[in-house]
Regions:
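Short, conserved sequence motifs used for protein processing/export or organelle targeting and
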Residues: 1-123
Length: 123
């Protein structure tokens, strides 16, 4: 059982604007160790930017947690919207609520996809 919350994602983006986003993972899956969870974020357009170098990183095109960042279930990052208008941007998230036993057994895993549309121009 896992819930993925993204706070700060706009319904409609302004081209070139940066948005501060908080990713929260909620689960009744309790950890018996230091490791609490993890995540991977991908975006179809624009750029993902690291805010907290200790706990997040860009790895092979994904924004993800670091080893230190696996101690948490909440992370912050920025998304810079594309500089030109595109019909839609898809923000994809995979989240894990770890049970802390250093194996994938009994970890809660979930995904979330959010569609972000451009701000409508006033005519």
């Amino acid at each position: 059982n896992i819930e993925i919350n993204l706070i700060g994602v706009p319904k409609n983006y302004i081209p070139g604007k940066e948005y501060l986003i908080t990713l929260e993972i909620k689960s009744d899956n309790e950890s018996i160790g230091e490791n609490q969870g993890g995540f991977a974020v991908n975006v179809s357009d624009g750029r993902l930017l690291v805010v907290d170098k200790m706990n997040t990183q860009i790895l092979e095109g994904y924004l993800t947690h670091t080893k230190e960042g696996s101690r948490y279930r909440s992370w912050k990052f920025r998304w810079k919207a594309p500089s030109r208008v595109v019909d839609e941007v898809i923000l994809s998230v995979m989240g894990v609520a770890s049970n802390g036993d250093f194996s994938p057994n009994m970890d809660a895993v979930g995904t979330e996809r959010i569609k972000i549309l451009p701000v409508k121009s006033k005519k």
